[in-house]
């Protein structure tokens, strides 16, 4: 066993040879390298597959042996200071290694087809392979300085990949926004690391945990200083895992290619913050104020992310806010000390969200020939609908991913989310209420995404109806109200120019010619007009979807309880995950062998599933089979004419829509307060520098010049002038002497 662990350091380095080969090829023989560019996908996938096999072998040994292995190289700077570099293999490391490698391989396979026509194909594979290397190095790090080094590499790779299409101004702005926002958290992380180094004189995890176990309980260290340093460490996780209030970069990160969106949201960047907290949880758990703050931030984030996802029309941004909300669940679980539930949800969510993002990429890929290659159109759910007829495999996989995230058994996320909900109710009813309510919202907005994308009729022609005199379907808001002529379309955040009904009953009447166009378009055979239809993607893109579907169906089994004997007349139950995590759980004395009451489990499961089903039902009422409502528009329009006054419910819907679609006005607030404020401060500083500082300096010089000129003309070389001024000076001197 130890012999295998000795070579674990190879895992992060395995993708490097192909990265260096592609880099040198692009610099030295660019033409030949680009001509053979599709060949480079194979070694990238092969080397990461070797890393996956190695990681799987380590994980099996972890489950069977339940041991922690650490190997260090000491680099002595002087007699008083030395740095230690190495790698750490424990249950948390093995879980993250499998997660990163499996999702990374599937994303690479998917990208080979998805990016095949892109000029930056090789550059994309270099970036994404280095992204995987950085994350593998992060999770195997044995101390804080190594974590910070790879932490910054992960941030750099995300910057490069989010701005991959840097010629698009929106993408360039998005990567800068992500970079700057994460710099705030990274600065806090660096200060926290330096603070703990000043306290302990070491950057090793074992020394930090010694503080938690010995010094803090015995008041051997300043608790206020320790709390401050722990808060700074947590700030790094807040930015990297898109927690409130540093979450604003996450939806803009969708400007990158869809495969990298899947990797960022499933196994790399946003998982890094959760990993950091899980790694340092033995330290945080000894600081009650920090734990309460972590759980509070997680609760705010999970609710905020769900509300902001309600009215998004971009399919990828909707999924991005979903990720934000689910990361909030993990943060809440860590804050209440539910280490196992947090990691369980990290695993199940990673595979489900990777499935959803790659499925959305398949949808986007099929829509681009119809609506163009602009993300504003190809990612717009307004122009989708009825795709279940054209992309049945993608539709099936997307539906399973949706139901999993909604918490429907026996899919993966049901088991992990149910455990978090149960633990949150036990910890605090306040957290339990918000987490449970958000579970219903999750089911609502996720099923909304599915219905707008795959249900009803294909609405691709809505983009051309703005000139139709009888009615405009493209100008219908997502909440069912037509955009009036008086709407200010230049509002700083409101880009609402199109949409699909949120409440289907209020859809305006469709003209006859419009209905005919829709009918002929959505009928593949016998259509009068010739159209290009959406089509299923190739096998290279479908294969990762099917593999992720299997993970979504069965990965939840690692958290299912099985009989582990009887103790004190109670049945002890154990899960594969709890056995896997036993060494890590023992670090902070959490009992891995918990007694489970089947009745309590069923009660909690029924309540959580009921909330999910209720959310699905409400979403289906508002969005399901939109074409069936089109047939009753005359009746609905008659009701609207009879009741022209807006009800209180309409006002509430309008407010909720405005809040959700405009991102809670948080970006607007940051723009007004921070961006414009900093610009005004810069202008004021520039004025003070030029007008006051330079003015004083230039004024002194100018005054000296003028005085010199006056003295020059005073002398003139005449003795009479010298005598005159001499007498004047003597007279003044005598006059002022008392």
From Swiss-Prot:
Give the domain of life: Eukaryota
For this entry, list what GO says about its biological process.
ATP synthesis coupled electron transport; electron transport coupled proton transport
- Recorded catalytic activity of this chain's protein: a plastoquinone + NADH + (n+1) H(+)(in) = a plastoquinol + NAD(+) + n H(+)(out); a plastoquinone + NADPH + (n+1) H(+)(in) = a plastoquinol + NADP(+) + n H(+)(out)
* Gene3D superfamilies with a match to the protein in the record: 1.20.5.2700
Gene Ontology CC annotations of this record: chloroplast thylakoid membrane
Q: Which residues cross the membrane?
A: 9-29, 39-59, 89-109, 125-145, 147-167, 185-205, 219-239, 258-278, 280-300, 327-347, 354-374, 396-416, 425-445, 542-562, 610-630, 691-711, 717-737
- Please name the Pfam families in this protein's record: Proton_antipo_C (PF01010), Proton_antipo_M (PF00361), Proton_antipo_N (PF00662)
Membrane topology label:
Multi-pass membrane protein
Q: Print the keywords alphabetically.
A: Chloroplast, Membrane, NAD, NADP, Plastid, Plastoquinone, Quinone, Thylakoid, Translocase, Transmembrane, Transmembrane helix, Transport
Q: Which Enzyme Commission numbers does its entry carry?
A: 7.1.1.-
Q: Work out whether the entry's keyword set contains Cell cycle.
A: no
Name the Gene Ontology molecular function terms of this record. Answer: NADH dehydrogenase (ubiquinone) activity; quinone binding
User: Where in the cell does this protein reside?
Assistant: Plastid, Chloroplast thylakoid membrane
**Where is it chiefly localized?**
plastid
NCBIfam families given for it?
Answer: NDH_I_L (TIGR01974), PRK06590.1 (NF005141)
Q: Which family does the similarity line name? A: Belongs to the complex I subunit 5 family.
Purpose: NDH shuttles electrons from NAD(P)H:plastoquinone, via FMN and iron-sulfur (Fe-S) centers, to quinones in the photosynthetic chain and possibly in a chloroplast respiratory chain. The immediate electron acceptor for the enzyme in this species is believed to be plastoquinone. Couples the redox reaction to proton translocation, and thus conserves the redox energy in a proton gradient.
Assembly and partners are described as: NDH is composed of at least 16 different subunits, 5 of which are encoded in the nucleus.
Spell out the protein name for this chain. NAD(P)H-quinone oxidoreductase subunit 5, chloroplastic
């Amino acid at each position: 066993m130890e012999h295998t662990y000795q070579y674990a350091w190879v895992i992060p380095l395995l993708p490097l040879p192909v990265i260096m080969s592609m880099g040198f090829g692009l610099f030295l023989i660019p033409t030949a390298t680009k001509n053979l560019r599709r060949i480079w996908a194979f070694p990238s996938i092969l080397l990461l597959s070797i890393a996956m096999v190695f990681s799987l072998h380590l994980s099996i040994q972890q489950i069977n042996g339940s041991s922690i292995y650490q190997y260090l190289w000491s680099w002595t700077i002087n007699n008083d200071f030395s740095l230690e570099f190495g790698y750490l293999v424990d249950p948390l490391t093995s879980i993250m290694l499998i997660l990163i490698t499996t999702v990374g391989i599937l994303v690479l396979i998917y990208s080979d087809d998805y990016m095949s026509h892109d000029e930056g194909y090789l550059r994309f594979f270099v970036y994404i392979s280095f992204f995987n290397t950085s994350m593998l190095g992060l999770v195997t790090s044995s101390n804080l300085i190594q974590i910070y080094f790879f932490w910054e590499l992960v941030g750099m790779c995300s910057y490069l990949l989010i701005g991959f299409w840097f010629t698009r101004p929106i993408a360039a702005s998005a990567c800068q926004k992500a970079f700057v926002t994460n710099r705030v958290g990274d600065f806090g992380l660096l200060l926290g690391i330096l603070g703990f180094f000043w306290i302990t004189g070491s950057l090793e995890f074992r020394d930090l945990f010694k503080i938690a176990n010995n010094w803090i309980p015995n008041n051997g260290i300043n608790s206020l200083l320790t709390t401050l340093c722990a808060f700074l460490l947590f700030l790094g996780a807040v930015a990297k895992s898109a927690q409130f209030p540093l979450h604003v970069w996450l939806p803009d990160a969708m400007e990158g290619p869809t495969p990298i969106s899947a990797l960022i949201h499933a196994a790399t960047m946003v998982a890094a913050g959760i990993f950091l907290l899980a790694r340092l949880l033995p330290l945080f758990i000894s600081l009650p104020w920090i734990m309460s703050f972590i759980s509070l931030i997680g609760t705010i984030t999970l609710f905020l992310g769900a509300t902001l996802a309600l009215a998004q029309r971009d399919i990828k941004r909707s999924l991005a806010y979903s990720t934000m909300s689910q990361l909030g669940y993990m943060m809440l679980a860590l804050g209440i000390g539910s280490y196992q539930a947090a990691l369980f949800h990290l695993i199940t969510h990673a595979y489900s969200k990777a499935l959803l993002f790659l499925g959305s990429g398949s949808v986007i890929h099929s829509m681009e020939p119809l609506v163009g290659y602009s993300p504003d159109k190809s990612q717009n759910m307004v122009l989708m609908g009825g795709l279940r007829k054209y992309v049945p495999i993608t539709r099936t996989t997307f539906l399973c991913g949706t139901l999993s995230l909604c918490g429907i058994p026996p899919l993966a996320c049901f088991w992990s989310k149910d455990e978090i909900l149960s633990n949150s109710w036990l910890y605090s009813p306040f957290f339990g209420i918000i987490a449970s309510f958000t579970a219903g919202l999750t089911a609502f907005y996720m099923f909304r995404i599915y219905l707008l994308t795959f249900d009803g009729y294909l609405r691709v022609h809505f983009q051309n109806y703005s000139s139709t005199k009888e009615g405009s379907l493209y100008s219908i808001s997502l909440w069912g109200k037509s955009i009036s002529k008086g709407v200010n379309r230049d509002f700083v955040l409101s880009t609402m120019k199109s949409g699909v009904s949120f409440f289907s009953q209020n859809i305006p009447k469709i003209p006859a010619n419009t209905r005919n166009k829709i009918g002929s378009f959505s009928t593949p055979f016998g259509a009068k007009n010739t159209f290009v239809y959406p089509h299923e993607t190739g096998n290279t893109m479908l294969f990762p979807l099917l593999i992720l579907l299997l993970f979504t169906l069965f990965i939840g089994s690692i958290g299912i309880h099985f009989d582990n004997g009887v103790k004190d007349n109670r049945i002890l139950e154990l899960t594969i995950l709890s056995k896997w995590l036993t060494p890590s759980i023992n670090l902070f004395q959490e009992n891995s062998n918990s007694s489970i009451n089947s009745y309590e489990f069923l009660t909690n499961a029924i309540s959580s599933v009921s909330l999910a089903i209720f959310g699905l039902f409400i979403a289906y009422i508002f969005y399901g089979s939109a074409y069936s409502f089109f047939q009753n528009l005359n009746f609905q329009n008659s009701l609207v004419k009879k009741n022209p006054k807006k009800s209180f419910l309409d006002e509430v819907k309008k407010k909720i829509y405005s809040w959700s679609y405009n991102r809670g006005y948080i970006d607007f607030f940051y723009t007004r307060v921070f961006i414009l404020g900093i610009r005004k401060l810069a202008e004021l500083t520039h004025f003070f520098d030029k007008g006051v500082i330079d003015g004083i300096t230039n004024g002194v010089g100018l005054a000296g010049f003028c005085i010199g000129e006056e003295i020059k003309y005073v002398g003139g070389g005449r003795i009479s002038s010298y005598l005159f001024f001499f007498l004047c000076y003597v007279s003044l001197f005598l006059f002022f002497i008392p």
